[in-house]
């Protein structure tokens, strides 16, 4: 649902039709290169800085797209090496990789881990190349990633790397940014699209709770507040919001 559709809407937002412009159906099953509705099976990348970022920020959308028969890939920039107090980087990474694998089983996504280090992410020529080559190899139709204006440096680095890849790959995929703890981490986030996640909310929570080391019972309160607020914006109980990156100049209706 985009901003214009939201403004025109007179009833409760319904799951179905499209998600970020992609056809979805609640009972779709994979069928070769097509989904159950007969539409072309698309590839969607959700690129997060840490294990748990894609799940908390766009986990509901991933579930909806995977259920519709689309190829959903969870890409983690780091292995969350600095994310467990008292554990070494290697110990924490081993734990968080398993948690991420379990979460992907819930959302229906496959996973890819990149080579950056939690808390020490970089934006340089080598890292630009690494991200660009991964996205080029996967050849997605849509990429979802962090809003680059973020108080968490790892989030900001991730968004910047993906944005650069989008430009250098001739904008051949649609790029959507998601929010993370808006106001605390994501700053000045201005959504263009909303996704009603009521039907998969419990499953999103299950995926997030796979990240046991992150104490989701406390952390998720921020995300639950965002889900509720974005739901109020589009007249449903829970939603995820996205900002589409487009170089097109705005035009009158």
Spans of model-derived segments:
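Metal-dependent de-N-acetylase/amidase catalytic core
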Residues: 3-16, 21-47, 110, 122-253
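ATP-dependent adenylation/pyrophosphate-handling site
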Residues: 44-51, 55-89
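Glycine-/small-residue-rich active-site loops that bind phosphorylated ligands and cofactors
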Residues: 53-54, 119, 150
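Glycine-rich, phosphate-binding/catalytic loops in enzymes
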Residues: 61-67, 91, 160-163, 194
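A conserved beta-strand->alpha-helix junction
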Residues: 77, 104-117
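A short acidic, helix-capping loop that chelates divalent metal ions and anchors anionic groups
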Residues: 80-87, 120, 184-188
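Short glycine-enriched, charge-decorated loop/helix-capping segments at active-site entrances
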Residues: 87-91, 117, 191-194
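Glycine-rich phosphate-binding loop and adjoining beta1-alpha1-beta2 segment
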Residues: 87-107
